[in-house]
């Protein structure tokens, strides 16, 4: 089956548990249609470069999946219809990268910096 990576932005007024619940919900949609969610990362609330639907911030989530194209199309369709999801980006990849995504690596590197004066 083809491999995909998805980035989803949800509304800023959701709680963290609600945003993570969306990830679980769309992972279940994939598995119901014959695919599987390989990995998921919740990146937290981030400021966007421009407003989307009058929102300056959003909950970012990253999903890696191994699913047939019909399952991915159904998941994207449901994401676009869902009121809490503002944007979705899906790309097809040859292979999934090992370890955490670049966003999560940056967060880890920030912890190693010395304190400001």
From Swiss-Prot:
Keyword annotations of the record: Ribonucleoprotein, Ribosomal protein, RNA-binding, rRNA-binding
CDD domains reported for this sequence: bS6 (cd00473)
Any one of the GO BP annotations: translation
Region called Disordered, residue ranges: 96-117
GO cellular component: cytosolic small ribosomal subunit
SUPFAM superfamilies tied to this protein: Ribosomal protein S6 (SSF54995)
Molecular functions per Gene Ontology: small ribosomal subunit rRNA binding; structural constituent of ribosome
Top-level taxon in the UniProt lineage: Bacteria
Compositional bias of kind Basic and acidic residues: 105-117
Functional summary from the UniProt entry: Binds together with bS18 to 16S ribosomal RNA.
Family, as annotated: Belongs to the bacterial ribosomal protein bS6 family.
Protein's recorded name: Small ribosomal subunit protein bS6
Organism: Ruegeria sp. (strain TM1040) (Silicibacter sp.)
Gene name for this UniProt entry: rpsF
